[in-house]
């Protein structure tokens, strides 16, 4: 009898080993060697976009190469880590859709019972042994349309992730443009100070010649030298600031290095550049607004799913049982079958906490949508006013202030060369011209940044048929 019992145990172990063997080998297989479950694109257009989205190593521009604003935008869209993280979020949300579409798997149960070592299990083959063997399959049946609601919530969350990508792209490319113009301003500042130093060098040579001739005093030459030293110190600080600004630009682009060997191309916008006018739908189609709307729609779908959780799921099962009789066991029933239904009893709770949390999340998403909508409208008005102020300041600087400062400096240079004025008047005129040129460069940068920020604020989502969560029922 023990021998027979051991044979039965060995047979059961062999069956379990046959079932567990492939699973164990699959689990032991290296992750890199297993192909990932593909997420089939919805159409050929998405397949082409997925092929074009192959990762390309992000590298800084070659040393000595010029860097344009267009190249900055392209590198930022390709290499900016925040944009990359947002795109990973879209991929994760697509996987969530696949997960949500998976229905519960059936459960197979195999069992052997009523094994009596003392009475024995009878003679004959395994099928004739007087043991009660059971084969059972159970399947969970989701009620209240939970499966479709779960897929709907996942799809709306995926749509929200897509809108978030567009909002992040608009924001981060705008940050890169701001960093580009900031670095360009510091580059122009270095150029202005370099021209000033060249002027001081020419004046020094002329002053030494006049000093030898006795036309100027030694004190005047010393004053010129001191002012030139101050200008040199200003230029060193400007160079340091320019390197810092280019390093910040590289960080905004997402490329390694500091762009120390790259010169920026002065892509200044024209003073009369066309400024887009917002229409009635611009605010509603901004990427951050559409992202908030999509998050609200996803929260509404999740709330519906949580409400459906109050209805219990049903588990149905079918069982086949084999319990033969023998001279030592007359209680066998032969082959018998059975069906089962299992329903959880909502005695202690009805998943009310989940439903309440989903309700709170919905209203939090609604508040966030309203906040984003309000801030977007205020931002457009504020940036419009800021742009007009920067445009007027730059026009005044170009048309009035800078020509006047250049005229005064030119007159002072001429008068000093003829001995009609002293060195202090010359230095005052030069300081005024230098500061005016620096202010003009700053005004140019402020106008460029204001125009860039305003254009970013007016960007609209390119997604067609974006969900309108404001229509979700309360």
Residue ranges: model-predicted function:
Residues 84, 107-128, 141-167, 187-189, ...:
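Small/polar (Gly/Ser/Thr/Ala-rich) solvent-exposed segments
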Residues 85-100, 168, 172-195, 202, ...:
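Amphipathic alpha-helical coiled-coil segments
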Residues 1-7, 12-13, 24-46, 439-474:
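Acidic, low-complexity, intrinsically disordered peripheral segments
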Residues 151-155, 218-227, 423-431:
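Short, charged, amphipathic alpha-helical segments
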Residues 26-112, 131, 140-141, 149, ...:
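Bacterial Sec-pathway N-terminal export signals of envelope proteins
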Residues 131-137, 335-341:
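Hydrophobic, lipid-facing positions within transmembrane beta-strands of outer-membrane proteins
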Residues 168-285, 386, 390, 450:
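Periplasmic alpha-helical coiled-coil/stalk elements that build and connect Gram-negative outer-membrane
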């Amino acid at each position: 009898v023990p021998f027979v019992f051991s044979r039965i145990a060995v047979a059961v172990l062999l069956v379990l080993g046959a079932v567990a063997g492939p699973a164990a080998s699959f689990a032991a297989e290296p992750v890199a060697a297993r192909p990932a479950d593909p997420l089939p694109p919805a159409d050929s257009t998405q397949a082409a976009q997925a092929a074009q989205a192959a990762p390309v190593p992000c590298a800084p521009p070659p040393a000595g190469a010029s860097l344009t604003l267009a190249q900055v935008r392209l590198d930022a869209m390709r290499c900016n880590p925040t944009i990359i993280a947002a795109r990973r979020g879209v991929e994760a949300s697509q996987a969530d859709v696949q997960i949500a579409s998976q229905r519960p798997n059936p459960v197979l149960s195999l069992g052997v019972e009523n094994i009596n070592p003392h009475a024995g299990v009878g003679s004959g083959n395994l099928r004739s042994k007087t043991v009660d063997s059971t084969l059972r399959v159970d399947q969970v049946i989701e009620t209240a349309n939970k499966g479709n609601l779960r897929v709907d919530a996942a799809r709306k969350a995926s749509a929200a992730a897509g809108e978030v990508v567009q909002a992040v792209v608009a924001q981060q490319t705008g940050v890169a443009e701001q960093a580009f113009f900031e670095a360009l301003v510091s580059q122009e500042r270095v150029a202005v100070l370099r021209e000033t130093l060249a002027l001081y060098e020419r004046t020094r040579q002329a002053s030494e010649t006049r000093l030898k001739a006795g036309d100027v005093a030694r004190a005047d030459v010393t004053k010129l030298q001191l002012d030139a030293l101050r200008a040199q110190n200003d230029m060193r600080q400007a160079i340091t600031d320019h390197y810092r600004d280019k390093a910040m630009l590289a960080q905004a682009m997402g490329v390694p290095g500091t762009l120390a060997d790259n010169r920026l191309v002065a892509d200044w916008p024209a003073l009369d550049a066309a400024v887009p006018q917002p229409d009635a739908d611009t605010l509603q189609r901004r990427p951050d607004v559409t992202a908030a709307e999509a998050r609200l729609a996803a929260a509404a779908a999740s709330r519906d799913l949580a409400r459906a959780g109050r209805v219990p799921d049903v588990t149905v099962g079918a069982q086949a049982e084999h319990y033969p009789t023998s001279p030592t066991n007359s209680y066998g029933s032969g082959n018998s079958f059975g069906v089962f239904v299992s329903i959880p009893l909502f005695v202690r709770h009805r998943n009310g906490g989940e439903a309440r949390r989903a309700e709170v999340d919905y209203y939090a998403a609604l508040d966030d949508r309203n906040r984003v909508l309000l801030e977007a409208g205020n931002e457009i008005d504020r940036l419009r006013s800021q742009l007009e102020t920067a445009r007027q300041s730059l026009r005044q600087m170009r048309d009035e202030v800078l020509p006047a400062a250049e005229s005064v400096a030119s007159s002072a240079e001429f008068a000093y060369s003829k001995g009609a004025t002293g060195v202090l008047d010359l230095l005052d005129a030069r300081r005024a011209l230098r500061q005016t040129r620096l202010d003009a460069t700053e005004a140019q940068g402020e106008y460029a940044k204001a125009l860039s920020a305003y254009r970013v604020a007016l960007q609209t989502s390119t997604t067609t048929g974006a969900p309108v969560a404001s229509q979700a029922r309360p």
